[in-house]
């Protein structure tokens, strides 16, 4: 009888030895819900790459919500990233190469190796074995929901993790494989919906984090979702989804409002796009899904990229399940998730797209050369009219005046304000009314340049500062100084402080004013690299769009 306590104690010790994180002979080992994995060490960080969070969406699982991953018995190697999701072979490099060239730097495009088997994520822990319960930051990469990967080397999370957080980066289905709508898909779905598969992947990854991140030393109740461009849009969209409740506590949105100028496409429009693509791919088949699921994924993506000329097929839609209503209405009605929010933009978001478009499309139209500034700005005004009403033309007079003297800057400023600053300001105000803590920034540190190469703080330029990725091949061409190194450290501290406590401030840094306490206040990461508190984030006419949102009269009716 006396042996019973000993046996019980021994059993508990053996159980803990099998479940608790440990360091094996070749690297750190963690037991997850699907099985055990072995990662590697990167300086002080423990790194785990290529962790499956859902079953491969191949064969009959193409265009279905993500399914649970099959368990494995042996210790799985987690030292190499998983496949990128199928996309244009040039990937992110197609965006960076012409920008680098504009500054006189050579940049070689490296083709992306991708696969339909791509639902993997990566984890960086600041130390091993884990101690305590650390905040978690989950990264959603940008790329218009058509290109990119959470395993891009520019998103290496080790530098951010060193600030005392767990970093997770994920892949999610892209383009036609991630956002395809078709009436037959809706008919076979138990939720009577189609499309939004890439967003369902993101939700599945967040559920994986909820269930497993504790094994890495992370706190499943303190998760910050952060992303850039399309990743930021997706994060803002997920704030409106009932499927995201309790999956994250904070959001950092870099240059991506979840609503903007134009209406959200209807289900009928989205499904019509899908029917057109299906006809292009498999003809008038009586069972188009059977034949579409047999097509090689790369062939399908290539067909859409090269032959389809209709509306964007890589866009989300209000499907009645993931998104019950248009996001703008949910923000305006206060139906969003209760989260802390940080949002911001770069000083000249649109400047790089002129360079990228000209490089991508031979003899691409150059409206700044072929049209006068009046015509160009008027096109913005026509698009903006549903949002700003009769005040539109008066509101943009300053852009027209500026464009007369500096075409590029005038058009860039019009686009920055109308497409990003106004919606982000509305998002900040509506979130503050619902949840409280909101912080807003403007990143204006720019790459030095003259003439046409002076693109300013273009779209995506804050990324190497957030991840301290100046030595990564994507950004090695940047002329980095001690000022940039210091600014990167300050930005990382602000971002991780926010993830820890919902407040980016610390006693040793410039004070970042809270939008919820002083609407319109923000911090500027100024051209000289100094964080400076400011007032007046968006021009006054942006209040018109906010009024329309509140009155349910705006975009996304």
Annotated model-derived regions:
Residues 7-17:
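Bacterial N-terminal signal peptides
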